[in-house]
Amino acid sequence: MRSPQLSCSASEGRAVEAALSVEHAGGRSMLRRQHVGYPLHVTRGFYLDAARPDLLTLYLQSASGGLYAGDRIGLDLSVARGAAFHLTTQSATVVRDGRGRGAVQRLAVNVEAGAFCAVTSDPYVLFPGAELALASEATVADDAVLCMADGFAVHDPHARGRSFTEFSSRLRIRRPDGRLLLQDAGRISGEDLQGALGRFAAAANLVLIAPPDRLPPVKELQQAADRCGALAGASAAPNESGLVLRVLASDGGTLSCAMEAAFHVAAAGALGVALARRRK
């Protein structure tokens, strides 16, 4: 493993660019390139699914206790032809006070022909003053599958009535020829939270890009999240490219349960088999 260039100071935040490359070889998907540095850490690879022994699962961890003011974190992920890969987080990521600079997390994903890629994050926990911007871009081959999930939950550890500053998310998904399939963007401030979400304090999205015959029933995806006590709504993605699920929950634990359940429905539809539980 090589560590990328990193700048790190309490006043400026940290800037790091990381990369992961997954290929299929010898009947398994394998991590061919790993370029990761502090504060990110990637576990060893796991093969958790007897029904899909080729599927590689990695856990992405934060070694620093969360995201801090001024952090600029980037990750480039490539999943080669025929590979199957799931990148998830070990636990929720705490987002600290942005102090007027906030944190930015960038993700770029390339999924080649016949490949399966899932990138599912536990909710970002927004502490008072937190400001986080997510910027994600993906390129997905016509017969490939991409599942992406992320969201946030609000937490005021000292119960002083303080809220986060802002959470924003932008996602663009294209075909290899550059054709835009989907563009999704949202922004919410702590001041507007109650007006926008009502009694809910956590929200997330799941996007599944897949050929039509590899999509689960919309109702099944929605009901999986609802059974956890969340409020979910699913619909077709633009350009007949897949499905989009929106989820609201009262807290981060309920949201995590709902998103995990929805992921397993999405993965079963895309792969044709049920995946094992990802222990955290």
UniProtKB/Swiss-Prot annotation:
Pfam families: UreD (PF01774). InterPro entries: UreD. Keywords: Chaperone, Cytoplasm, Nickel insertion. One of its GO terms (cellular component) is cytoplasm. It is found in: Cytoplasm. It comes from the Bacteria. Its main location: cytoplasm. One of its GO terms (molecular function) is nickel cation binding. UreD, UreF and UreG form a complex that acts as a GTP-hydrolysis-dependent molecular chaperone, activating the urease apoprotein by helping to assemble the nickel containing metallocenter of UreC. The UreE protein probably delivers the nickel. HAMAP family: UreD. Required for maturation of urease via the functional incorporation of the urease nickel metallocenter. Belongs to the UreD family. This is Urease accessory protein UreD 1. It comes from Bradyrhizobium sp. (strain BTAi1 / ATCC BAA-1182). The gene is ureD1.
